[in-house]
A protein has these predicted regions:
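Short aromatic-glycine-(Arg/Gly/Cys) micro-motifs in beta-strand/loop hairpins
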Residues: 35-57
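A short linear-motif detector with a strong N-terminal bias
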Residues: 43-46, 64-67, 128-129
């Protein structure tokens, strides 16, 4: 099974040279595209709801995203090389991000514009943790439509293939 990581086109304002990734491996410092990471939106709440039984390596500050299907070229491709790859429900991350948008737009909208009808941030973070699966579990059951795949360690450079 391969995972994929988009490379933003070179003529884009946000292009990051993939050569860094090919030299050093893929990690939070060498990503070529930002993906959603619901666990890092409200770190204080995320930490409060984190089970004490979870491994220490689950640290959203170092996590970065990937995809299950090949995106539009160019992209990076690598095998699922580790058990430090987890899947969360991306819809929950989107709902959490609505709170970020609400805070940003509060002066203009009066607050609550993006979050009306949503559960509290705390409830969403709790649901986010409950949605956590290993990549194998997700592939076996596919309990939600939009997976948020997060990798919690560096993908070794020797495993990465650049597809142009």
């Amino acid at each position: 099974l391969y995972l994929y990581h988009t490379v933003i086109e070179q003529d884009s304002d946000i292009h990051i040279n993939p050569q860094n990734t090919l030299n050093e491996g893929l990690n939070i410092r060498t990503v070529t595209r930002l993906y959603t990471n619901g666990g890092d939106l409200y770190p204080e709440i995320t930490d409060r709801f984190k089970s004490i039984n979870l491994p220490k390596w689950i640290d959203f500050k170092i996590a970065f995203g990937a995809e299950l299907v090949p995106p539009t070229k160019p992209y990076l491709r690598f095998p699922t090389f580790s058990d430090k790859i987890l899947v969360f429900n991306q819809d929950i991350s989107s709902d959490l991000f609505a709170y970020i948008e609400d805070e940003y737009m509060e002066e203009e909208t009066g607050g609550g514009y993006f979050t009306e009808g949503l559960p509290s941030k705390e409830d969403l973070v709790s649901q986010y943790w409950e949605s956590m699966l290993t990549i194998e579990e997700y592939l076996n059951y596919k309990p939600y439509k939009e997976p948020e795949i997060l990798i919690f360690e560096t993908v070794p450079a020797k495993l990465i293939e650049y597809i142009k």
